[in-house]
Every structure is written in structure tokens, then in C-alpha cells.
Amino acid sequence: MSTIPVIEKRERADAKLFDGAVLLAAMRAAFLKLTPRHLLRSPVMAVVMGGTLLAAVITASGHGNAGFGWAVTAILFVTVLFGNFAEAIAEARGRGQAASLRRARKDLVARRVETALGGRETRVPAAELRPGDFVLVSEGEFVPADGEIVRGLATINEAAVTGESAPVLREAGTDRSGVIGGTRVLSDEIVFKVTAEPGQSFLDRMIALVEGANRQKTPNEIALTLLLAAMTLTFLIVVASLPAIAGFVGVTLDPLLLIALLVCLIPTTIGGLLPAIGIAGMNRAMSANVLAKSGKAVEVAGDVDVLLLDKTGTITYGDRQATVFHPLAGIDRAQLRDAAMLASLADPTPEGKSIVKLARQQGAVAVEPEDAHFIAFTAQTRMSGVDLAGRNIRKGAGDAIVAYVQAQGATVSPELNGRIEEVARGGATPLVVAEGRHVLGVVELSDVVKQGIKEKFAQLRAMGIKTVMITGDNPLTAAAIAAEAGVDDYIAQARPEDKLARIRAEQAGGRLVAMVGDGTNDAPALAQADVGLAMNSGTQAAKEAGNMVDLDSDPAKLLAVVEVGKQQLITRGALTTFSLANDVSKYFAILPALFAAAIPSMAALNVMHLSSPRHAVLAALIFNALIIPALIPLALRGVRFRPSSATALLRRNMLIYGLGGVLLPFAAIKLIDLALVATLGA
């Protein structure tokens, strides 16, 4: 389900997983985290640290074999360090990403101007810019702050922020008018309006997020922490009651063995890895060039039930081009062509530009008339046009144009519906053109469904995720494209309020909803959705409303976001299963060591035939410690995700991480025992 660019970015991030500088920083941080305040955040590791201190006190007081006591103390201490190291290495990777972003933030001087049209120019430090200021940026200069272009267009290099080397076009009056501080203008000149306070820019927020400054536990993570705490408390009570029970059968238990039993009983593996898994989830989203504003957003993406997907750019390539002019009976093709071109001269959309291009190719002369008043397209009117010299030309959705003509007291030829249906059934978009009270004809806009998208939707369906296509097209076009793409449902002739209403309806049914948006009119729906993925190229309002921002501005990235979320949940579940399963083998190592001397029949539990009770304890504790760093790469990279049903995923993970979690420790503890015999003797 993942796209190739996402995979490539993730592989580049993984290549630096164990970079020397990252390792060194993580090692230092592991020791710095040995504070009560930090350890108490993880009940499991807090108990292990308490056991470490108690073992040290018992050994220092001269109880039992000093060598064995200090060995147990050292292994327990290293277990805590490894847990801290797992979290620290995830944080260090985040700080590495933040450092690269910080290099993009420069001490710049801005050319502040009086109005959007220019005026007197004043050079000021970028830190003095405030929302509402107008700034002029020319070729070769850096954009000093976040803002919206109000005049001009330019190609901009955003590699310092997004990692993409290809320049992007930003233009005033379009849905790609947003600029980010720290990026560089490669050509042309723009005036933009500042939208962010100093220290609150997009880059500043990115740095804070990837550094973990706003890192908070997700609801599922909190629930799992509470479960681990309850299990730890239960095992603590059980172990504390063992000496009294053993006393009834005349057995005296070594307190060091009791500490070892407790540490082996409690789920130390997942306890040590849980913080790293949460941090790594946000890092994986960042590796996919998606900025998640919280860990909760990443996690919820893995639980979504419904995806609301814009047709353009997500399901189709988003490059609708005018291909044919269809005049109605009695209308000359040149008349329709010229009217459509006039209505599109000031249209900044790709569709509008393609109409002008097609008209020119067919002989029209594109000269902007004087005293023309251009009518911009809005989601409410769903049409645009031009008023000039007594002529009123409109182009837009069929029903919107019909309503416009009928409002002037005119009737519409039945032929129009036939033309619209003919174009729509072919999967193209019909754009109706009218002048005054007369409908002139239909412009055919063609787009292509993306290759492989139908298979992706089939995978989502297998996982129980419903897909809903949102389009401004008429129902016939929407139905044709929906059938070709394989989506489960569609909303035709959609307006912003329709998106919001659909999200609320799905949520009322207990479902989690994800959607993509880039315009100001998408902001309410983005804010309402459980996962709102805003496009980096979109408006500031959209980016503020969403809980994720795609730096590549690719609407299809929502599918990759779902993959990252699923991988986050599967990784936590798989490692929790493994942690609980591998406790079984440790029971068979520790229990015979506790009771075999006094109760010979307990020796039957020594199924691994470990050499001695002390070696059994040391082998179990060593495995318990070493398994944490051994699983760090898996925790950070995530368990490999294959789209399938929840039942199939559960079966696969139980087989690999459940059964594997039982069998691997048996073999590992036996090998460690053999190594101890070879090193220390029987």
C-alpha cells in the first residue's frame, strides 16, 4: 500500500539508525534518565530499579554469595539502562531531524513593503516581522517568515524543510499560495503577507515536535501503561507472599532469587521499549514527510474506519484538461470556444488555463478585454465567469449554470442534459458555458484514474476501511469514476459543508474518519475529522485545522499515513505479545532454582536442564536484559505491515511473536547457561 517515495525516505532514515553520534548521545542520555522522576513514568522499570537498589543493599550487608549478589545487581542495573537507552535513541534520532531543520532557520533580513502592491521598502530583521506585514522577496533570496503570497508567482526550493529537491511553484490567488520561512526563491518575485508570529512559524513548530517537546502519551499507550502497572503490582504481591507460603513447607527463600523472580515475571521488555515505540511512530511519519502534531494523530490513523478522499490528485492524477468543445444545436463551435476562453482568462486553475490553451489551439485570440470584471469560482456558487460590455459569461457545474439561466427567466434545452450525460458517462467532467440567458454548450474536461489505485482500495476494504470519494463532478461522472477506481461510496457535487456533514454522520455511527484538505473552506472538516491531513501547499487555515501536514502536498499520502498508523499499532501489539510470551521460559528457569533444593520434585520443571540454580537465575536475567537492545531496531523501524484483515494480522502476529516469544527464550537461556558454565565453571 505504501508509495515508492515513502519507502525511499524511510530507508534513508533507517540507514542512519545507528549513526555514531546518535549512539553516543543516546548512551549519555540513558544515564541522565536514571532519576526518580523519569523512572516513575514507567512502573515496570521503576520496580526493576527498586530491585536493583534492594539487591545492592542485601549484597553489601554480607548476605549470601557476594559474587552472585553483585552479578544480579549489575544485570538489573543494565536492564534499566537498556530501557533508558531505547527511549534515548528514539529521542536522539528526533533531535537529529530537528538539527537539520534548524539549519534551515537563518537570521534573515526582510524587505518589508507598505502594501501588497509594493510601496516604500524597509529592511528589517526577520524576527521583527508580525502577522499582516507585507514582504517582498526576489530571485535568490530566502523567504524570511511564513505567509501567503498576495502578488506574483515564483518557483521555490523547499528542500531545507521538506527534503524534496525539486522546486515547487507558488502563486497568489491559488491553493498553492503558502510559503514557509527558510525556503529559497529560485525565480521571479513575490509579495507575501506574514501569517505567523516570531517563534511560532511552521519551522519552529516542526522543530519542537520532532524534538519531542510536545510529546504526550497516546490514549492506547496510557491504557497499556496502566495494564503493565496492574500486572507489576499483581506480581509484586505474589512474590511478596511467597516467603510466607514457602515457610509452611519448610523452605527458606533467598531474597536475591525473589528479586530475580519478580523482574522475570513483570513485562520488562515492553516496559523498556514502550516509550521508544511511541516516539518512533512520529519519527516514521516524519520520514514519510508527514508532520504529525501529536502521537495521538499517528495512532488514530491506524484505527480509522472511513477515508474521505478528494477525487482530484488522490484518485485521479489531478490534471484535468479541456479536450473538446460540445456546442448545443444552433450554436457555432467558435462562439462556444470564444466564450469559454473569455470566462477563463483570469482563472488561475489548471482547468481554466487548459481551456484558454485549447481555444488558442483552435484559432481563438486570447486578448484580455478592457473594463472586464472577472467572477471568481467559489465552492458555494460552483461557477466563475466574466462581465464585460453588456455580456455576462459564466462557466461551471451543470446544475449551477442551469439555475443561473433559469433565474433570468429563461428555459434550458433538453439537449443539454443529453450532452452532460454523454460526457459524464465517459468518466469526464462536463463544464457548462452560458452567456446571458442562453446556454452555449459543454466543455469536456478529462482526467485519468491513477494506476494501481483500485488494488489499494481493495486492500483497504480487506482491512475493513471504507473509502468515500469526494468530487464536485455531477453524479454521473462521479459514479463512472467511482466504479473505475473501486471506491465504496462517493459524494457528488460536494460542497465544504457536505464534507463536514458526512464526517459527523460517520462519527455518530462510532467510526473514525480521516480526510485530506488544502483550502480555507476545508478547515472545519479538517478540524472535525479524527485524522485531518492538510497539504503544505495549502492555506494557513487548513494547516492549523489539521492534525497532520503533508510536506509533499500529495493528497494520496493519506494512504501512507494509514500505513504508518497501522504499523504503529501492530508494532506495539506484537512487542507486547512477545514480552508476555517470553516470560513463560523465564518461569521454567527461575522456579526450579527457588524450590528444587527443598522440594526435589520441582526439579522436573527444569526442562532446559540448566546447570545450577544460580546459573539459571543469571541466564534468565541476562536474557531479560539483552532482549531489550536486541529489539530496539524493530521498535524503531516498526513491524512490517502487510495489508490484510484484522483476523489474518492477529493470526500472523500470534504465530511469529507469540509462539516465537515462547520458543526463542528457551534456546537463548540455554545458550547463555552453557556460556556461563564455560566461563565460570559448573
UniProtKB/Swiss-Prot annotation:
Active site positions, chain numbering: D310
Subcellular location: Cell inner membrane
Statement: the UniProt record of this protein carries the keyword Nucleus: no
Sequence intervals crossing the membrane: 44-64, 66-86, 233-253, 257-277, 588-608, 616-636, 658-678
GO biological process: potassium ion transmembrane transport
Substrates-to-products reaction catalysed: K(+)(out) + ATP + H2O = K(+)(in) + ADP + phosphate + H(+)
Gene Ontology CC annotations of this record: plasma membrane; potassium ion-transporting ATPase complex; potassium:proton antiporter complex
Domain of life from the UniProt record: Bacteria
Disulfide bonds: none
Keywords: ATP-binding, Cell inner membrane, Cell membrane, Ion transport, Magnesium, Membrane, Metal-binding, Nucleotide-binding, Phosphoprotein, Potassium, Potassium transport, Translocase, Transmembrane, Transmembrane helix, Transport
Binding locations of ATP: D347, E351, F377, T378, A379, Q380, T381, R382, M383, S384, K395
UniProt-listed Enzyme Commission number(s): 7.2.2.6
Annotated Mg(2+) binding sites: D518, D522
MF terms (GO), sorted A to Z: ATP binding; ATP hydrolysis activity; magnesium ion binding; P-type potassium transmembrane transporter activity
Disulfide bond in keyword set: no
InterPro entries membership: ATPase_P-typ_cyto_dom_N, ATPase_P-typ_P_site, ATPase_P-typ_TM_dom_sf, ATPase_P-typ_transduc_dom_A_sf, HAD-like_sf, HAD_sf, P-type_ATPase_bsu_IA, P_typ_ATPase
Listed Pfam families: E1-E2_ATPase, Hydrolase
Membrane association type: Multi-pass membrane protein
PANTHER family reported in the protein's UniProt record: POTASSIUM-TRANSPORTING ATPASE ATP-BINDING SUBUNIT
Quaternary structure and interacting proteins, as annotated: The system is composed of three essential subunits: KdpA, KdpB and KdpC.
Role summary: Part of the high-affinity ATP-driven potassium transport (or Kdp) system, which catalyzes the hydrolysis of ATP coupled with the electrogenic transport of potassium into the cytoplasm. This subunit is responsible for energy coupling to the transport system and for the release of the potassium ions to the cytoplasm.
Homology family: Belongs to the cation transport ATPase (P-type) (TC 3.A.3) family. Type IA subfamily.
Record protein name field: Potassium-transporting ATPase ATP-binding subunit
Organism: Xanthomonas campestris pv. campestris (strain ATCC 33913 / DSM 3586 / NCPPB 528 / LMG 568 / P 25)
